[in-house]
């Protein structure tokens, strides 16, 4: 599993905090905005592309509020994404919604909270079962 991460200009500082946190946890991290800072649309599309390269990959996109990146990610067929600003939602969106990307706002989530959000997301496992009905419904929408 690789964690694909990207940020626009507003999210770069928080992205670096999250990237360091993930590397400390021995996760493979791919930074799509390491060499070129783009707007949230292009950054999100780059993250989605890499996440879709393997069923095991997860993605994290950071912009100022998390909403713009969320809107972009959910426009892509088959992508389930969630904008999160708390730990519980990050964990539950993996367990119940099988979200493969989360978006965060650098002006919403402080570094400590962001680390906890990331922990919940990457450690969460999809529960399947009764939740698959909703995931199938989401996938039919695109």
UniProtKB/Swiss-Prot annotation:
Coiled-coil positions: none
Pathway: Carbohydrate metabolism; D-galactose 6-phosphate degradation; D-tagatose 6-phosphate from D-galactose 6-phosphate: step 1/1
Alphabetized GO MF terms: galactose-6-phosphate isomerase activity; ribose-5-phosphate isomerase activity
An annotated GO BP: pentose-phosphate shunt, non-oxidative branch
Catalytic activity: aldehydo-D-galactose 6-phosphate = keto-D-tagatose 6-phosphate
Enzyme Commission designation: 5.3.1.26
Zinc-finger recorded as keyword: no
Keyword entries, A-Z: Isomerase, Lactose metabolism
Subunit structure, as described in the record: Heteromultimeric protein consisting of LacA and LacB.
Family: Belongs to the LacAB/RpiB family.
Protein name: Galactose-6-phosphate isomerase subunit LacA 2
Organism per entry: Streptococcus pyogenes serotype M1
Gene: lacA2
């Amino acid at each position: 599993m690789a964690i694909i991460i990207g940020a626009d200009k507003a999210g770069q500082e928080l992205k670096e905090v999250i990237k360091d946190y993930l590397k400390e946890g021995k996760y493979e991290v791919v930074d799509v905005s390491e060499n070129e800072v783009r707007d949230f649309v292009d950054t999100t599309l780059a993250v989605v592309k890499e996440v879709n390269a393997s069923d095991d990959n997860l993605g994290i996109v950071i912009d100022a509020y998390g909403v713009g990146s969320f809107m972009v990610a959910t426009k892509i067929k088959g992508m389930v994404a969630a904008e999160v600003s708390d730990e519980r939602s990050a964990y539950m969106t993996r367990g119940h919604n099988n979200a493969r990307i989360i978006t965060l706002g650098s002006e919403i989530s402080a570094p400590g909270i962001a680390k906890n959000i990331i922990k919940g997301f990457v450690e969460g496992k999809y529960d399947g079962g009764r939740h698959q009905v909703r995931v199938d419904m989401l996938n039919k929408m695109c």
